[in-house]
Swiss-Prot record:
Pfam families: eIF3_subunit
Family designation: Belongs to the eIF-3 subunit J family.
Subcellular location: Cytoplasm
Gene Ontology CC entries for this record: eukaryotic 43S preinitiation complex; eukaryotic 48S preinitiation complex; eukaryotic translation initiation factor 3 complex
Biological function: Component of the eukaryotic translation initiation factor 3 (eIF-3) complex, which is involved in protein synthesis of a specialized repertoire of mRNAs and, together with other initiation factors, stimulates binding of mRNA and methionyl-tRNAi to the 40S ribosome. The eIF-3 complex specifically targets and initiates translation of a subset of mRNAs involved in cell proliferation.
Protein name from the UniProt record: Eukaryotic translation initiation factor 3 subunit J
Chain's gene name: HCR1
GO molecular function terms attached to this record: translation initiation factor activity
GO BP terms in the entry: formation of cytoplasmic translation initiation complex; maturation of SSU-rRNA from tricistronic rRNA transcript (SSU-rRNA, 5.8S rRNA, LSU-rRNA); nuclear-transcribed mRNA catabolic process, nonsense-mediated decay
UniProt keyword annotations, A-Z: Coiled coil, Cytoplasm, Initiation factor, Protein biosynthesis
Domain of life: Eukaryota
Length: 268
């Protein structure tokens, strides 16, 4: 018996089982990575696939279907135009600044200069806030006082403003303001003017005394403005009976002689 007599079955290639060209083809269907051509080759990490971007969120729509107004839509026409004009001007200025920035142009833009001048004029026309350090002399009533009429207007304004302080504190008004103020104001006056001031104050004193006396006596019945107790009440007068009970006409009931004899006319 020889080896030639034995029959061997030789497997033939089919379309379903293609021939393996390389070792890598054999492991293509495996989960393992393909074999490297050399053991010394560096392993290149695989790039991870970027996740797909999520679709943008759809814009919110009003459930009621109503149009949502912006803040600028609620303004009146004039204000809205001013805001739009200002926004357009700012946009132009920003574009011009970005354009000329690279060119090294240091000159101020005409619109920017006009806007700055307008703001400066508005700041000058705006009245300054009053503080404790604001000098009274800068007020026109002081700085423009020249004629007698101007001084009278100044007096009326000062008297109204200062006299109103008495309502806050009468004690401080008299002790810390009015008395010392009268003295300080009277210092530049001449002696004759001070005497006139004293006479005016004396008249005021008498007027205040009269008012206080009237107010006090108004609470008492029968009082007078001069401080008296008033007129006394007149006593009731006795009725005049025509002298019927005078002494010379008195008669006695015991003397009946006149009534004793009635004469012939006596019916008894």
């Amino acid at each position: 018996m020889s080896w030639d007599d034995e029959e061997f079955e030789v497997r033939t290639s089919t379309k379903d089982q293609p021939m393996v060209v390389s070792w890598d083809d054999e492991f293509n269907n495996d989960d393992d990575d393909a074999l490297l051509e050399s053991w010394d080759a560096e392993e290149v990490p695989k790039q991870k696939q970027k996740p797909k971007a999520a679709p943008k969120a759809a814009k919110k729509v009003d459930k009621k279907g109503e149009t949502v107004l912006l803040e600028i839509d609620t303004l009146d026409e004039k204000t809205r135009k001013e805001l739009l004009k200002k926004a357009e001007l700012n946009s132009d200025l920003n574009n011009a600044a970005a354009l000329f920035d690279g060119l090294g142009v240091a000159e101020e833009h005409p619109r920017a200069r006009a806007l700055r001048q307008e703001e400066e004029l508005a700041a000058l026309s705006r009245p300054a806030a009053l503080t404790k350090q604001t000098p009274f002399e800068s007020h026109p009533l002081f700085s423009e006082a020249e004629t007698k009429s101007d001084f009278q207007d100044l007096r009326k304004a000062l008297s109204t403003a200062i006299a109103g302080m008495a309502e806050k504190s009468s004690l401080n008004y008299s002790g810390a303001l009015a008395i010392d103020l009268i003295r300080d104001v009277a210092k530049p006056l001449s002696i004759e003017s001070i005497r006139q001031t004293v006479a005016t104050l004396n008249v005021l004193i008498k007027e205040k005394e009269r008012q206080e006396r009237q107010a006090r006596l108004a609470k008492v019945k029968g009082g007078t403005a001069t401080g008296g107790a008033g007129k006394k009440k007149a006593k009731a007068a006795r009725p005049n009976l025509g002298g019927a009970f005078k002494k010379d006409q008195e008669f006695s009931l015991e003397d009946n002689s006149e009534f004793a004899d009635f004469g012939d006319d006596d019916f008894m």
